[in-house]
Amino acid sequence: MDFIVIDGSYLEGGGQIIRTAVSLSALTQKPVKIINIRKKRKNKGLAPQHVSAVKAVKKLCNAEVFGLNVGSEELTFIPSKLSPKDFTIDIGTAGSISLVIQTLLPLSLGINKKFTVKIKGGTDVKRAPPIDYVKNVTLKILRNFGVLTELKVLKRGFYPEGGGEVIFEVKPSKIKKFDLIEHSKSNLVEGISYVQNLDESIARRMRKKAVDLLNKEKLLPNIKIECSKGISTGAGIVLWNDTLGGSCLGEKGLRAEIVAERAVNELLKERESGMALDKYMGDQIIPFLAFGKGIVGVSEITNHTKTNMWVVKHFLDVDFEIKEYKENNCNGFTIEVV
């Protein structure tokens, strides 16, 4: 049997290599072996959220898998035919639900009937997109290009206890050709300022600060407040401006106003580039761009984006052309499939 062998320590050598490789292995029916998994990280090998993501894909394609345990630095994934089914996956920690969703998303392009998965873990955790970004930026953009999904957030989960719960539905999808270079210039900034097990005044302070800062920029803020109870405690704010996002997670000792300011600044920096996609969406879109072809505009090319292109090229006969883009007061890059 011929395996695609992928070096998991390439560039930033993170979990994204595993997510993209396993997803594309299931989609293309090509077996893959990933070596040196997260070799440069302090905690080497697979983390619980990676194990959960691989298990989810394994369920959907009856794969044979070797090395699927926390800490494993080598993983072999041998897929069979995709056969959608409903199931529940419990990451068992505050491991990121968003990153499991990222792994399942491309499978929409290879299934013949819908599946629904209940995922338990962390909805709003460090080093992962917040669940409201996934819902209002990632999935919305992909829906416009034919990727059909629904996401319901039932409970929020924060580090370390987790306890978040979502229902994620994926339907058979046919990807359209991408043509998404410049931002729409929409002035509407929507958002959610949320707290769990904390005083509502914190959410109100985050919203007030964000609204004041956005008004100064002549933008139109529409930010909702959400207060909930759960087994974990946390706060944060997520903003979105059509196809761009900005967010910040609350931390002990970090004033509500600072949290809001960081989220607003992140969004404004992305808006300044004039490009359609922010740096996070720039890497998430790569597998879909490979299948749909076409061109997208991004604010910057990150190592995550380069890594995703590199992994995709192991499975698909595609090449990506990156060019600087300076038209119409924009300052970013285009990525085109050639």
From Swiss-Prot:
CC per GO annotation:
cytoplasm
Catalytic-site annotation from UniProt: 304
Keywords from the named record: ATP-binding, Cytoplasm, Ligase, Nucleotide-binding
According to its UniProt record, what is one Pfam family this protein matches? RTC_insert
| One annotated GO molecular function | RNA-3'-phosphate cyclase activity
Please name the GO terms of the biological process aspect recorded for this protein, alphabetically.
RNA processing
Source organism's superkingdom? Archaea
Name where it's found.
Answer: Cytoplasm
Record-listed ATP binding positions: 102, 280-284
Q: What is its EC number?
A: 6.5.1.4
Q: Read off the NCBIfam families from this record.
A: RNA_3prim_cycl
What is known about what this protein does?
Catalyzes the conversion of 3'-phosphate to a 2',3'-cyclic phosphodiester at the end of RNA. The mechanism of action of the enzyme occurs in 3 steps: (A) adenylation of the enzyme by ATP; (B) transfer of adenylate to an RNA-N3'P to produce RNA-N3'PP5'A; (C) and attack of the adjacent 2'-hydroxyl on the 3'-phosphorus in the diester linkage to produce the cyclic end product. The biological role of this enzyme is unknown but it is likely to function in some aspects of cellular RNA processing.
Name the record gives this protein:
RNA 3'-terminal phosphate cyclase
